[in-house]
């Protein structure tokens, strides 16, 4: 079961997989909804499962379970789950609301990339939150990477500009950019995200670029609604899903992929520096069901 062993699968414990009838399908659909796949995704998954079971004359419970896993894996395959780091530098902009774990996620990704031999620079463009740059600097020291920061209240665009200039001058492989936590319904803060993206496009036009939204798995379907607005503003390329170990509703990964057509790229499964892991659809689905 690997890294996803911490995902609770209690919603599926009561299902009798050997009795394949209408009651089974109804109970399975309810369980998928309770696990946070959402009503639409759950209904579609069960409908497809009915068709597969009928067409292949499946009778064994284990075979039904495997058929469902394959359906969910297909739903998760909406894009490359690996970061595009094909240029030097590559730019990764990390966004999200307050309290979801953006800065911590950046630090853990930096640690992972450093371990892969990458030269990493952290950009402290969260200049609104007190001590945000200090927190990022602690992570820079832990991961043994460089950081560009300014004073509290400085223009985030200026910090980003300086970071990109430093990255080009120093031969950095990856720039990880922290941003202020923002509510998806605050127009000014969302407009600032657009400004940061324009600076990246202007200063590093040929660079590989990622925009990763950090979501707290425990917020479930509410997080999904946030993500839809961020997608419109920021052009998301991937999701970092934190606190997946703290929820019984691990199915949110499937809902995100289906509703947003944006791949989950990393999942947080604990507090340790190595507990932010690249997402693997097969391992995830096997742990879930």
PLM feature segments, named:
Residues 180-182:
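Short glycine-rich anion-binding loops that position phosphate/pyrophosphate groups of nucleotides
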Residues 156-170, 184-289:
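Conserved catalytic-core segment of NTP-binding enzymes
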Residues 22, 43, 58, 62, ...:
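Non-catalytic, surface-exposed connector residues within folded enzymatic/regulatory domains
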Residues 39-41, 129, 245, 273:
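Short hydrophobic/aromatic residue motifs in ordered secondary structure
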Residues 95-96, 178, 214, 268:
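Short beta-strand segments
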Residues 125-128, 152, 218, 244:
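Structured loop/turn residues at secondary-structure junctions
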Residues 4-125, 132-177:
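Primarily NTPase-proximal linker/entry elements flanking Walker-type ATP/GTP-binding cores
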């Amino acid at each position: 079961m690997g890294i996803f062993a911490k995902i609770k699968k209690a919603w599926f414990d009561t299902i009798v997989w050997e009795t394949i009838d209408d009651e089974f399908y109804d109970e399975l659909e309810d369980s998928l909804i309770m696990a946070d796949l959402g009503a639409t995704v759950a209904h579609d998954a069960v409908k497809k499962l009915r068709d597969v079971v009928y067409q292949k004359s499946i009778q064994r419970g284990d075979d039904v379970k495997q058929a469902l896993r394959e359906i969910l894996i297909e739903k998760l395959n909406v894009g490359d789950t690996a970061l595009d780091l094909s240029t030097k530098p590559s730019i990764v902009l990390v966004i999200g609301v307050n309290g979801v774990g953006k800065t911590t996620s950046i630090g853990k990704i930096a640690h992972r990339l450093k371990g892969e031999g990458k030269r990493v620079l952290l950009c402290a463009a969260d200049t609104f939150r007190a001590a945000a740059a200090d927190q990022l600097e602690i992570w820079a020291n832990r991961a043994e990477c460089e950081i560009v920061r300014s004073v509290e209240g400085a223009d985030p665009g200026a910090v980003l500009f300086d970071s990109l200039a430093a990255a080009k001058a120093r031969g950095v492989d990856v720039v990880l950019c922290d941003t202020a936590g923002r509510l998806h319904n605050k127009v000014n803060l969302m407009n600032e995200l657009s400004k940061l993206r324009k600076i990246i496009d202007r200063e590093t036009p040929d660079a590989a670029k990622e925009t990763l939204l950090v979501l707290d798995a425990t917020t479930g379907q509410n997080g999904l609604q946030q993500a839809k607005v961020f997608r419109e503003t920021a052009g998301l390329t991937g999701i970092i899903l934190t606190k997946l170990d703290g929820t019984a509703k691990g199915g949110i990964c499937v809902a995100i992929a289906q509703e947003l057509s944006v791949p989950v790229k990393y999942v947080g499964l604990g507090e340790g520096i190595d507990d932010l892991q690249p997402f693997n659809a097969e391992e995830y689905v096997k742990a879930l069901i």
